[in-house]
Amino acid sequence: MNDAYKTYVPVVGRLLLALMFILSGFGKLGNIEGTAAFIAGGGLPAPTFLAVAVGALELFGGLALVVGYQVRLAGLALGLFTVAASVVFHAFWSAPAEQQYVAQLLFMKNISVAGGMLLISALGAGPLSIDARIAAGTGTRFKPALAGNA
């Protein structure tokens, strides 16, 4: 693969994955009451606290992906959160028959996004990122072919 591909594709991938989290985070933080009611409906404790915490995680984790800062941590946190949220809120296996199809689609979409987040946590941000600049400043060279140093 050429260098342009290794340079720009990680940025595009981070932006596409981040978009869902940023918009969802803004939505949750802009409607704490509604988000808390939804969370309470899932049977979770402290719904208002969780609404704020989840909204902040999605917003700031998504922004971290956009700029390429601490993407390993952001990817891991967002990936684990997405799996947990999918199991709690899109449990198609226990949904009424008329809701199973949509719940399964949402579950599988979220699990796929979680897979992308876990890949980011393993592979890093790529060369066009704050993480790569920090690594370069500490004497560690980012090698796109290895994709493991940023």
What kind of region is each of these model predictions?
Residues 1-30, 40, 47-56, 60, ...:
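Extended, low-polarity transmembrane helix blocks
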